[in-house]
């Protein structure tokens, strides 16, 4: 388990490979473990980092850290703590929303982004994310596919308040507008 301490709080991450830094950001019910197969493939060419966002996996769980702004600050502080100057980002769901916000606020720190499965508006957010209990969300999002046991165990570490806080913050955002304001090369798959 790799950690860095930011403002006295533990941030958990895992890293594989050598090369240019590539950050993987997980979805609403997940952690770094979600990305293992992709990290293994990417680590041939890149230094692949998978970070547990505030409230997920083994990263600290404090409700005041769960806003999208705090998640963006986590990435910036993480890069500074590790001495990383520029990254590429791959994000899914919540990770895509955090990644998009990070790129718009810090275009000089990101050379490209691949963002998938993020809603362009609140009407595109599945109501289950707001209302379903965590075990139901884990089953829905991870399915029953073989090989999901480790990811399922990690997903159960999610603080449901972290999911709700990010969804509440999204109500004030126009993600389509943010996407249009990006100057960093972007490949996106939206809902």
Residue ranges of each PLM-predicted region?
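Catalytic nucleophile-loop/oxyanion-hole region of alpha/beta-hydrolase
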Residues: 61-72
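Conserved acidic catalytic loop of the alpha/beta-hydrolase fold
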Residues: 70-87
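Flexible "cap/lid" loop of the alpha/beta hydrolase fold
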Residues: 97-105, 109-141
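Conserved HGGG/HGGXW glycine-rich cap/lid loop of the alpha/beta-hydrolase fold
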Residues: 9-60
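N-terminal cap/lid segment of alpha/beta-hydrolase-fold proteins
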Residues: 1-10
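Conserved alpha/beta-hydrolase catalytic His-Asp/Glu region
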Residues: 123-190
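Residue in the alpha/beta-hydrolase core beta-strand immediately N-terminal to the catalytic nucleophile
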Residues: 52, 88, 111-114
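Conserved alpha/beta-hydrolase "nucleophile elbow" surrounding the catalytic nucleophile
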Residues: 26-28, 87, 91-96
